[in-house]
Amino acid sequence: EEAEFHGDHVNFDKMWAYPKPVQRPHPPILMGGDGPRTFDRVVEYCDGWMPITGRASAGPSLAEKIVLLKRQAEDAGRDPDSLNITSFGLRPDPDLVGRMQEAGVDRVIFTLPSEEREAVTPLIDKCAKFIS
């Protein structure tokens, strides 16, 4: 299947992309962000929310935000359990991951520094302990 579009701001000739996604109906659509309209967009358009954790932010805690997001989904007539929560920016710390699980996070994405192999390999080994 080929796509082509010629508009005022976007213009491309016929093209194709492979491999095609195996997820049906499509790969999960996650939205990051923490702004005032984020939850509106997550509830309307997305399969989940991906807040960047591990940095200070004012206002409600992550657990409180997850409750607010799920409540907003329910108010909009959407199954709150259909929203997946992915925490981005964590270090591989068992206590921190446990707190994320308690808060309602479904998946965590660890961050690794851009350093030499000798510095990063032990961190990858720590991350591997969380994969089951």
Regions found by a protein language model. Give the residues of each.
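Active-site-adjacent structural elements that line small-molecule/cofactor binding pockets in enzymes
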Residues: 1-132
